[in-house]
């Protein structure tokens, strides 16, 4: 069977990526979604909840342009794991939602 169509959020992520690639724009994008951050970013910066100190500054070296198949790649999964590990150090009780 064909893959399901992208969700509205995934559609918007693809549209935003198309805009900044087509126009050579730099975008500062704030999100609470690790999946969205890894999909869109060339660099992810994670700030601590108290005081805003730097928790993580990581390059995302996935090739561009990215498509929804990127979300199933080993490199994508590795970046998500790194973010979740960093977040777990700062989440109350080490629990990541």
Residue locations for each model-derived region?
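The feature captures the ABC ATPase H-loop/switch
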Residues: 16, 32-35
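Conserved H-loop
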Residues: 24-30
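Helical segment within the ABC ATPase nucleotide-binding domain
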Residues: 9-24
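Conserved catalytic segment of ABC-fold P-loop ATPases
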Residues: 39-46
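ABC-family P-loop ATPase nucleotide-binding domain
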Residues: 92-97
């Amino acid at each position: 069977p064909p893959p399901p169509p992208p969700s509205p959020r995934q559609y918007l992520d693809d549209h935003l990526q198309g805009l900044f690639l087509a126009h050579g724009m730099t975008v500062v994008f704030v999100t609470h979604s690790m999946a969205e951050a890894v999909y869109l970013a060339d660099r992810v910066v994670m700030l601590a909840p108290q005081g805003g100190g730097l928790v993580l500054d990581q390059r995302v070296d996935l090739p561009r342009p990215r498509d929804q198949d990127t979300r199933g790649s080993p490199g994508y999964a590795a970046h998500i794991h790194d973010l979740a590990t960093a977040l777990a150090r700062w989440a109350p009780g080490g629990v990541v939602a």
